[in-house]
UniProtKB/Swiss-Prot annotation:
Function: Mitochondrial sodium/calcium antiporter that mediates sodium-dependent calcium efflux from mitochondrion, by mediating the exchange of 3 sodium ions per 1 calcium ion. Plays a central role in mitochondrial calcium homeostasis by mediating mitochondrial calcium extrusion: calcium efflux is essential for mitochondrial function and cell survival, notably in cardiomyocytes.
Database matches in PANTHER family: MITOCHONDRIAL SODIUM_CALCIUM EXCHANGER PROTEIN, NA+/CA2+ K+ INDEPENDENT EXCHANGER
Cellular component GO terms, alphabetical: mitochondrial crista; mitochondrial inner membrane; mitochondrial membrane; mitochondrion; plasma membrane; sarcolemma
Designated name of the protein: Mitochondrial sodium/calcium exchanger protein
Organism per entry: Mus musculus (Mouse)
Keywords: Antiport, Calcium, Calcium transport, Cell membrane, Glycoprotein, Ion transport, Lithium, Membrane, Mitochondrion, Mitochondrion inner membrane, Phosphoprotein, Sensory transduction, Signal, Sodium, Sodium transport, Transmembrane, Transmembrane helix, Transport
Residues on Cytoplasmic side: 117-140, 190-205, 251-325, 382-383, 438-445, 513-525, 581-585
Subcellular location field: Mitochondrion inner membrane
UniProt key word Endoplasmic reticulum: no
Catalytic activity line of the entry: Ca(2+)(in) + 3 Na(+)(out) = Ca(2+)(out) + 3 Na(+)(in); 3 Li(+)(out) + Ca(2+)(in) = 3 Li(+)(in) + Ca(2+)(out)
GO biological process, one term: sodium ion transmembrane transport
Keyword Secreted applies: no
Major localization class: mitochondrion
Amino acid sequence: MASRWLALLWAPVFLCVALILETASGTGDPSTKAHGHIQFSAGSVNQTAMADCRAVCGLNTSDRCDFVRRNPDCRSEAGYLDYLEGIFCYFPPNLLPLAITLYVFWLLYLFLILGVTAAKFFCPNLSAISTNLKLSHNVAGVTFLAFGNGAPDIFSALVAFSDPRTAGLAIGALFGAGVLVTTVVAGGITILHPFMAASRPFLRDIAFYMVAVFLTFTALYLGRITLTWALGYLGLYVFYVVTVIICTWVYQRQRSRSLVHSISETPELLSESEEDQMSSNTNSYDYGDEYRPLLLGRETTVQILIQALNPLDYRKWRTQSISWRVLKVVKLPVEFLLLLTVPVVDPDKDDRNWKRPLNCLQLVISPLVLVLTLQSGVYGIYEIGGLLPVWAVVVIVGTALASVTFFATSNREPPRLHWLFAFLGFLTSALWINAAATEVVNILRSLGVIFRLSNTVLGLTLLAWGNSIGDAFSDFTLARQGYPRMAFSACFGGIIFNILVGVGLGCLLQIIRNHVVEVKLEPDGLLVWVLASALGLSLIFSLVSVPLQCFQLSKAYGLCLLLFYICFLVVVLLTEFGVIHLKKA
C-alpha cells in the first residue's frame, strides 16, 4: 500500500515534467526575440501603446501589411509561422478567401496531428509509465489516463494563457468544452444507449466540477488569479484523486466482505466485466497492431527498421472502405514522422515494442526534436560558448549513446532499461502536442482578427470542437458497444481534469515564468458570463433531473441536453454580434 501512495506522489511530477521544462526555459531566454511588449505584472498587464490588431481589416489594402508588421499586438509570441503577416503580406487582397481556406485546412490538419499524437504515442507511453510505477487502474485513470485524454485541451490552455491577448481562448475552450461534453456528448450517449447511471460517482464528479466552475467564475469576476488561487486549483484536483481512490478502496472492501450480494445490490460502480473492458481499453490496447511486421521469423536489422517505420498495414488497407483509405493517406506523413521521432513502449507485448534499429535511431532524433520544439526552437539554435549550437551537441551526445545501445543490445530481446524509452517518448510526444497546440492558438487568433471575432467565441466553438471531437467519438463507440456508464463517467472525469489543471497549471507556470504574484484576466464582455452561466445551468439541470429519474437516463434526457446546447449556441452568436447586449447607463 505504501508503494502505491509513493507512486501516486510521483504521478503529478511526471505529468508536469515537459511543461516545467517549457516554462523554465522562458526565464533567461537566450534568444534575441522580443518579448518585452507584453508582460504580466503584479498590478496590471504592462503593454506598449498599440492599436487593436483587429483594426487591420478597416484599413486600405496597401496599408495592411505595414500595420501588422509594425503593430506589436499583431505579433505572435510563440510558434513557427506568422499567420497574420502571411495573409496580409504574401497574399493579394483578391486572394484573401483562398488564404482563409488554406488556413482552415491547416487548422483541421493540426487537430488531426493532435489527435494522432495523443492517441497513438502520448497515451501508450503514459500507460507504460503507470505500469512501471505499479499504479492501480483507478489511480492511473484519474492521473495519467486523464492527462493523456486531455492533452490537446491542456496544452492549448497553457499556450493560450501564456499571452494575455489569447487568455480568452483558454477560458472559452475550457468552458465551451465543458458545455459541449456535458450536453452533446452526454446526451448522445443516453440517446444511443439508455442506462442507469452510477449514483455516487455521478454525484461526486458533478459536485467537484461545479466547484471548479464556481472557482473559475469567481476568478473571472475578480479579474485575476493569484498564486494561492492557482495552487488551489491543483490542490482541488489532488483532493479529487484522493477521493476517487478512497471511494474505490471502500467499495472494494465492502465487496470483499459480501461477495454474494455485490452483483445484485451494487449498481454504484462499474461491473466487473465493464471494469475489465475499461482496463483493456485504457491499458492493454495494442497500439502497434497497425505497424506489426507482415513477415514472421528472424529478420535482419534493416528489415526491422523498414517494418517499424511503415505506418501502413497492407492487409488492413485491402479490407477498408474508401473513406478510411483517404483519411489514412492524409495521416501517413504525420504517422511516419511520429514513428521516426517518438519511441513507444508497450508492456503488454512480449518484446515491449522493442525495435533495436529504430529505438537507437530515436536516441539521436528524439532529443533533437526536444530542443527544436522547446520554446519554438530558440534553444536549439543557441550557441554554447559561441562555438557549437545546442542542436549539434545534442546530435553528438545522442549518436554516442545510440552507438553504445546498438552494440550492447540485440534485436530479439529488449534491454533491461528499455522502460526508460517510455519517458523519452512521453516528453517528445508532449512537445509535439505543445508545438501543434501553439500553431492552433495562433491560427485561431488570426482568424479572429480577420473576422473580428472575440477569442472567447473562437475558443468555445472551433477550439472546443476540435479538441473534443476525438473524445466524443470514443465515448459514442463505447456506448454502442454496451458500456454507456463508462462513457458517461469519462465525460465528467475528463473535464474536471481539464479545467482544474488547465487553469491552475497554466496560471501557475505564467506566475513562475514572469516572476509576478497574479495573472490578470480580461473577460470578453457579456459573452464570458453567458458561457459560464450556460455551463452552470447545464450542470444544475443534470444534478436535479438525473436523481429525479432515479438515475435511469432515457432518450428524452439526452434530447433535452442536445436542445440546451443548440439554444446555447444561438444565444452565444446573438451576443457576439451585438443582438443581445447590456443597456448602457
